[in-house]
A protein has these predicted regions:
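Short active-site oxyanion
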Residues: 36-40, 59-61, 153-154, 220-221, ...
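Short, structured coil segments at secondary-structure junctions
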Residues: 57-59, 67, 176-178, 237-238, ...
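Residue-level signal for inorganic ion chemistry
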Residues: 32, 43, 67, 155, ...
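Mg2+-dependent phosphoryl-transfer enzymes with acidic/Ser/Thr/Gly-rich catalytic loops
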Residues: 1-5, 21-22, 194-279
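Active-site phosphate-binding/coordination module
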Residues: 20-128
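Conserved acidic, metal-coordinating active-site core of Asp-based
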Residues: 106-225
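Non-catalytic pre-domain segments flanking phosphatase-related domains
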Residues: 1-8, 30, 34
Length: 279
């Protein structure tokens, strides 16, 4: 069956290691859209951080952001939004007080007070980079719970890989773990992990499934391309699941199709192979 919807992760997938969109990716995406294929960017990034990437692609597309919590167009029209109940966020923060140094609250707001933090240790170079790229959105508040005046999109933690795995294990074992979902994005080479605590029903896969149903596409007509653990659910849903050559090793050993690395234009290669080939 022909591919009618292509879901593409951003970091480590669409973008190369310099943060650019390789020309081969741009050409393949444009060719797919010209054939009537719909494209969705599906990312852990929040909307305002993903939008500049979307705007580099001069084609209509849907943005599934915050690991599936929000679905929006480039023009800002919202199709779906699932927020983390503030009381669940409060309970999570209370149960992870010893990880407070790397904790953030993210809200669906304009620039001001979009990201709240209590205290951050900037010794990790990746965390310093996060600060540099997001400083205009960051506001300090003590205690962090005081910022829960409305439901957040998520509670986000940043830290080393081993530290965040320990946190993930703790969150999985809490008695109220059914109140939230946990998504992890690991960068082992940088020893840096983003751990997101979201609404219990949120994942890239769930959002992609709902969007495909809304658009009238069967799973067999959906292609997904990703590289990290937070892409697993959408890869499991898609009829054609493709992992990047630079993906986490565990992702490449699950019997999925493997394309080139993000520096080799692996997204474009996959689209050429599975969506643009003549049948």
């Amino acid at each position: 069956m022909a591919i009618r919807l292509i879901a593409i992760d951003i970091d480590g997938t669409l973008l190369d290691s310099r943060g650019q969109v390789p020309e081969g990716n741009q050409r393949a995406i444009a060719a797919a859209v010209e054939r009537g294929v719909e494209v969705a960017l599906v990312t852990g990034r929040r909307y305002t951080f993903a939008l500049p990437v979307a705007e580099r692609l001069p084609v209509p597309l849907t943005m599934i952001v915050n690991n599936g919590a929000l679905v929006r167009t480039k023009q800002g029209e919202t199709f779906a939004r699932q927020l983390l109940p503030r009381e669940s966020a409060r309970r999570v923060l209370g149960a992870t007080a010893d990880f407070r140094m790397g904790a953030l609250l993210l809200f669906d707001r304009p620039k001001e007070n979009q990201i709240l933090y209590e205290s951050l240790d900037w010794n990790n170079p990746s965390r310093t980079d996060y600060w540099r790229r997001n400083r205009e959105y960051l506001t300090q508040i003590t205690p962090l719970e005081a910022g829960l005046t409305e439901d957040p999109i998520q509670v986000m933690y940043t830290g080393g890989v081993a530290e965040m795995r320990r946190l993930g294990e703790r969150l999985a074992g809490l008695e109220f773990a059914n109140e939230y979902a946990v998504q992890m994005t690991e960068y082992e080479a940088k020893n840096f992990t983003l751990l997101d605590v979201l609404h219990a029903e949120v994942s890239k896969g769930a959002a992609l499934r709902h969007w495909a149903e809304r658009r009238g596409y069967a799973a067999s007509e959906v292609m997904a391309i990703g590289d990290n653990f937070n892409d697993r659910e959408m890869l499991d849903f898609a009829g054609v699941a493709v992992v990047m050559g630079n993906s986490v090793a565990e992702m490449r050993s699950d019997g999925r199709h493997v394309t080139g690395t993000n520096d080799e234009g692996g997204v474009g290669q996959a689209i050429e192979r599975f969506a643009l080939r003549e049948t």
